[in-house]
Swiss-Prot record:
It is found in: Secreted. It comes from Elaphe climacophora. Disulfide bonds join 22-46, 25-32, 39-67, 73-94, 95-100, 120-145, 138-165, 171-191. This is Phospholipase A2 inhibitor gamma subunit B. Pfam families: PLA2_inh, UPAR_LY6.
Length: 200
């Protein structure tokens, strides 16, 4: 259950001026309808995203809608890999006003395992700021080593830690502090370039 909660958080806060109203919802699957909520003063667009959690042979998809900032709309695809058998990825789309009523939801392309020759330390700690690291093979656009440490949890969550390969887009999103959760909790995020895999 805690693992699924972590995965939800990964997706739920993948999207964060003017005061506009955006639909808010999170559902398993692809059809998401919810309530209207006024966005924050720095949020000037609505964001819909589809997130997939893959751990062969299982794959879980959920869709969410929330407020966001237009300067992150071009960062429409992100992925992370904290474990050689686990992949987290998301596709995002922005809209405003009536456009949100007709804009088709983002759709993730079929996942293809594509090792890119890079590696990072990876692990997940669901109840601690520390976790036991091991080397993870990066895939596709994952060229960064991402570390997330949740020190001061909110929403009644325990401490958490996450390390693994990540796409540069995901690191740029964190750099822009797009994640609403960062505003209410003490979260350390660090990205460094992934390193070439050593020959065995």
């Amino acid at each position: 259950m805690k693992f699924l909660l972590f995965c939800c958080l990964f997706g739920t806060f993948l999207a964060t001026g003017m005061c506009i109203d955006c639909e808010h919802c999170v559902v398993w699957g692809q059809n998401c309808t919810g309530w209207k909520e006024t966005c924050g003063e720095n949020e000037d667009t609505c964001v819909t995203y589809q997130t997939e959690v893959i751990r062969p042979p299982l794959s879980i998809t959920f869709t969410a809608k929330t407020c966001g900032t237009s300067d992150t709309c071009h960062l429409d695809y992100v992925e992370a890999n904290p474990h050689n058998e686990l992949t987290l990825r998301a596709k995002r789309a922005c809209c405003t006003g009536d456009e949100c009523q007709t804009l088709p939801p983002p759709v993730l392309e079929p996942q293809v395992n594509r090792p890119n020759g890079l590696q990072c330390p990876g692990c997940i700690g669901l109840t601690s700021t520390e976790c036991n690291e091991y080397l993870v093979s990066c895939q596709g656009s994952e060229n960064q080593c991402l570390t997330i440490i949740l020190k001061k949890p909110d929403f009644s969550l325990s401490e958490m830690s996450f390390k693994g390969c990540a796409s540069e887009n995901l690191c740029l999103l964190f750099e822009k502090k797009f994640w609403r959760f960062l505003e209410a909790s003490e979260v350390d995020v660090k990205c460094t370039p992934a390193v070439p895999q050593t020959s065995q």
